[in-house]
């Protein structure tokens, strides 16, 4: 158990969203005092709008960047292969799919120690948390869409993943 309280972490997250660190304010809602949510628009690519959900745990703050589409039942096995191949090479965070409803999201975490060290480290950590998922969606999102909407042509799932990982 860490010496910092969950309430302290919630306050750091609120300060970030309220622009205390850098003047950039975010639109967000607070649910149950430990869950924050909002939306992000304007990401480049075929999937452009995301919801974010941040949960404040006892040791970690987790951000989910949720795509605005749900994978149809008949495509969930193919998408799970795509996700598995992508996740194998990721160092930080991972893609997830809910097999019950097809929800797609990217999950990233930071430790409470990074958020509570000092304001500069907290800002850097929160920026990382908020941008990592978006960067991953920008990198892999077009080929998620290609797989979901039939734009992949004769490319295999492995080819789609390799294309994402070799493009600059």
Residue map of PLM features:
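Amphipathic alpha-helical segments
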Residues: 4-28
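Short histidine-centered catalytic/ligand-binding loop motif
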Residues: 2, 64-72, 119-122, 126
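Short, highly charged C-terminal tails/helix-capping segments
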Residues: 144-168
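Ser/Thr-rich, low-complexity intrinsically disordered terminal regions
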Residues: 19-47, 61-63, 67-68
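Short, internal acidic amphipathic alpha-helical interface segments
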Residues: 67-105
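Short, charged/polar, Gly/Pro-enriched secondary-structure boundary elements
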Residues: 43-49, 112-115
